[in-house]
Structures are given as C-alpha cells and as structure tokens.
Amino acid sequence: FKSNNYFHLILYAFKRILLFFYKMSIVKTFNEHFMEFVNDMLVVFPRNAEIILGKTALIGIKKINPSILIRYWYDYVNTPYKNDIEKGDIEFFINKDYSQDVKDFEDSGYFLKAIDRFREPIRNMQQENKEKALQYVKNLCALSDMYHKEKHGF
C-alpha cells in the first residue's frame, strides 16, 4: 500500500518537473521570437532610437524575470485582442486609442507612450513588412496561449 503512494508521489513530482521545463521552453521561445521581432524592426528602421531603447529595456526585463513578458502579453494583448489579431487587421492596432486599456495602470501615460513607440514604426512600414509584423504578433499570441494552458498542468 505504501509503495503505491510513493509511486504516485514520484509520478506527480515527475509531471511537475516536466511541466516546469516545458513551460520554460515556451518562455525561452517566446522571448527569442519577441527579440527577433524587435531585431527585424531594427532592420527596417536601423536608426530608430525608440526601438533601440525598447530592445534594451526588453533585454533587462528578460534578465530580471524571464516569464513576465509572456504573462503580460497574454493578459494585455492576447486576451483582449485575440479575435482582432486572428482577423489579421493590423490597421486596427495601429489606429486604436489605447487610453481605456491602460487607464487602471499606475502610470498610464508611460504605457501609452510605450505603445506609441512600438506602433509608430509599424505604421510607417510597407504593407509586406506590416504583414510580417502581424505574423510575429500571431506567433507570440500562440506561444502565450500555450504557456497559459500549461499553467495548470498536463
């Protein structure tokens, strides 16, 4: 009887370890893909100080808390805009007024400026590059979905 309990305990621990490593691989993939997105934006706009500043901030954030980007992406991009993202209308995001989305944030003005820093270069891209940017967003949403679904186990 006791050996059966130990077996279940070991199996549970093993599943938790597997889940942890699986989630960390999703986080790593998300962060790498996000940086690819930023780097591709820098190819299109190599002298854009806002993108360079954003990249530096993202690198710092990833070092302090690697999973924060994917969690925030899920909560503030994927969840509220999933249907719009799947429709593929990038102009919606470029032209949207985000003031209501960040009104409850401690420093909403800062976040509105950050959104503008990110979307302004996209607004000025050729259509082909806008479509690539949208594909990055779709991929990041898919990864954040995977991370969130695995949050509670297999």
Placement of each model-derived feature along the sequence:
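Terminal low-complexity "docking" segments
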Residues: 24-131, 145-154
